[in-house]
């Protein structure tokens, strides 16, 4: 018998158990997985690091080698896959809510984040996972890209040679490095269409002084310092109106535009020329003797030339709301309250631009000039858009604490892209997906990245709700299963998106789930059941949605409730509810954190305790789920949506095949709850406690003790699969917390393929191969 060298090599590979390259998991195979979400910087470190100060929002020292060193912690927890935070190089520096440890400020997609390791470290993590029969999903923050640069020579000495996308972005904002930005007006508003000079839009104090359009001056010359700056050096500026409004076109005098007296807040003086008699304004006509000013607009702008009434120019809150000129309204009618006042009663006002600048001369809509955070987001003039359509939210807003307005590229007279210093947010430019060159480069990148590091799945972090048609192409280029993070609680919207991207985070169900198990929410179970029913009726395949209650951007369950029953019911729902289970690192330890950054603590500071009751509880359910999937009933269990039943509004029954998950919001202090069913079908056992359900008069009585969840499975099958010890094995010192983790581990070991074969078996197989050759 002759055997080629190729056949010999294949024979030796098969004998020695060397696996071929990992094949991409299909969507159906991902349904079998239980995913542990890891924030790389906060999970584990391979070096000695100081205490992690989460409030500082800096890198704490977690890395890929640390994950490799603690894979057994994740595997023993029962998870079969991990999802790690973005891996690419980030912009450095503490701007925009601290350092980019979270991975949302990508600088260069073709370089790895040196804080986490190098190319070999990431490959080692991938290989280590696959060696344990586990899988790797990576977060990709594509929606945070703004770069317009593609340079072939930039990637020398990187892990592969491709054109790149690099953020060549400097800090734009203020004229000097203080806490508040200085927005740059549209270049097109200057008569000569040249860029604005520094002195035309900046002031070196703590607060900016905006410069009006140059075109409003009669002589079209630049504004002088004294024409737009404070009359004296106090903390707040005094704006100077347009010179052209004076009858004689001469400069304004100091007393005409400065505070009536030297207090802490200014009183702006309107144009003298607007009075019907053209005489100077009297003190009482433009000043108010309280602590806060109420500016008085021009009397002459009112159609009837009568004095303004108090309610027309004052607001009784702590901060004034200026009233724009009535004359700018097309109909010359008085401004309505909602047109010039704050959208809601907070500490900061939202100025309303002139209505006359809109192409249709209709009133501005709420969403066009307001933002519900503490800081305002100015809305540029609609007329500057090439198509004259309304600005969309993402075109002028920034979701951080400070605004960075980004004008539309098409508004420049020469139609060239805006330069960084002209508009300047360093990230959050959403137009990258519309540029064919960038789209192609990103698709090339993700394909090469997946192949290089043997990635099994991609998660689109902070996907946003724009460019819907872009994501399927990007996922197709990756060639692996994709999970999109579409942050919306709208069932209809999420299910509609699933027509294009089958994997999505189930935010609608999550919103109901975090409230469902709270003892003080008697309607919570009903609301959760209704939301699950909605998703079932609307979505193409709800079983491919990510099922979760925590992530790096949301409050942790232990901060919402400290009740152990609530926390365990939430864990049981994540792992046994419909969809792909996805648990955020630290939930298995009931870690706290109400908001960012406090919900991102360092896991290693807890010491990876496997005796933690929530760790053991999570491990028990995960191992049961895996054993169930690998059983003869696995296909039915995996592909069946839960039959939903509600008992007395407080108990939720989710039945999938022979498995009944019993969840509740009774709380730890509720002693017992009885639920009776017929014993004809099965004799049930709770695999979490390994206690059989008692039978009375051919009826089985389920008893919910202290609000803890149950997973019911036929008693005989539980014994056969080794999920629970048989009655012969039971002892009096049975641990009430359950000793399932040990027994299931033993059962799983007996079922799983042996990965470390003995030397004798290898030698025997090798001899057999040699005999075949001979």
Curated annotation (Swiss-Prot):
The record marks 553 as: Transition state stabilizer. A lipid is attached at residue 750 (GPI-anchor amidated serine). It comes from the Eukaryota. Residues 1-24 form the signal peptide. Residues 184-221, 265-333, 376-416 are annotated as: Disordered. It catalyses: Endohydrolysis of (1->4)-alpha-D-glucosidic linkages in polysaccharides containing three or more (1->4)-alpha-linked D-glucose units. One of its GO terms (molecular function) is alpha-amylase activity. Glycans are attached at residues 143, 187, 214, 243, 272, 299, 326, 355, 382, 409. Its main location: membrane. The keyword Repressor does not apply. Its EC number is 3.2.1.1. Binds 1 Ca(2+) ion per subunit. Keywords: Calcium, Carbohydrate metabolism, Cell membrane, Disulfide bond, Glycoprotein, Glycosidase, GPI-anchor, Hydrolase, Lipoprotein, Membrane, Metal-binding, Signal. It is a lipid-anchor; GPI-anchor. Gene3D superfamilies: Glycosidases, Golgi alpha-mannosidase II. It is found in: Cell membrane. The keyword Cytoplasm does not apply. The active site is at residue 461. Ca(2+) binds at residues 143, 395. GO terms for cellular component: external side of plasma membrane. Disulfide bonds join 52-60, 229-314, 495-539, 690-724. Belongs to the glycosyl hydrolase 13 family. This is Alpha-amylase 4. It comes from Schizosaccharomyces pombe (strain 972 / ATCC 24843).
